[in-house]
């Protein structure tokens, strides 16, 4: 059994690949933490795009997305950014839940599984 770890640190790997499935760690905003949920979501989706490219994949290969929102009042902003970004020909399954995130500045965290 071979597992490939992408961008590992002492705590986690950003992506773990096994049997052509890529399991992503939760992606969170880095540069937009003082901005609204729309901007944070756009940044996080951009980070996901970069990681997908790093493993030779793209958003049309996303199987599922789990989205954690700090406050459901931001659901419309999240959906606006998502709808601008998602591959409308091959949209993944998706769940969105409200959750207390690890950093109080984060409004969104996204976890995906994709093929590669």
Swiss-Prot record:
CDD domains: YjgF_YER057c_UK114_like_2 (cd06150). It holds the Pfam family Ribonuc_L-PSP. PROSITE patterns: UPF0076 (PS01094). InterPro entries: RidA_CS, RutC-like_sf, YjgF/YER057c/UK114, YoaB-like. PANTHER family: PTHR47328, RUTC FAMILY PROTEIN YOAB (PTHR47328:SF1). Belongs to the RutC family. This is RutC family protein HI_1627.
